[in-house]
């Protein structure tokens, strides 16, 4: 079966703010004439919750909705295609919850056309050369792969962690990711409240980013008590300077480390 991430939706946990909008999205897709299957990955219980609502409100859907449930205690590979994998990150919240680690697969090297033409490399050899093979001429001369190709861009990694209390142990799984989104519900002055509600402070999110040696941190999921969210940004940036405050319609250049609004 061939599908892309655009046909796959992932629910971390079954609190209402993370799944109430799903029924409307499914219905809207139907109104827009969608025909491709929709795959929804979630902790156990979402299909049981949504099956009666889909049967009642979405009787005439033009596509299939397929549920895939995963365990939340250990990391699990839940998606794999030729370009990317998605693995769960076990988190700790009031109910079973996971984050997600998105990992691009390394693309083949880029062919240097002038060199390939110069050595008269046959077309049928190009895939092997893209994947690192040297080329041997009819005369037996070995042409190093480095003379025929240039490296493709490094594969990127993105980790999404919310909702959760501070979990230092996940630093190993998200080590060195290009971009980490981590919830920062409270300021450090509310650390006790954060622990009580199984959430994280901005300082704790920044410490995790520092320990995991990530390249960029985006903090979000802020408590409504903070009218000025810069207090959370300042708290995190004091520990991990490469911190960005999540905003609606924010676009982040993972490679360049910049952010702008649409």
Task: Name these PLM-found stretches.
Residues 57-70:
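A glycine-rich helix N-cap at a beta->alpha junction
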Residues 9-18, 93, 221:
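Histidine-centered divalent metal-coordination motifs
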Residues 241-249:
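Conserved phosphate-binding/catalytic loops in two-lobed NTP-binding clefts
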Residues 35-39, 156-158:
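Short active-site oxyanion
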Residues 37-45, 218-220:
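Short internal beta-strands
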Residues 1-9:
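Single conserved hydrophobic/aromatic residue that forms the stacking wall/gate
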Residues 21-28, 227-235:
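Metal-dependent catalytic neighborhoods of phosphoester/phosphodiester hydrolases
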Residues 71-219, 228-239, 255-262:
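Metal-dependent phosphodiesterase/nuclease catalytic metal-binding core
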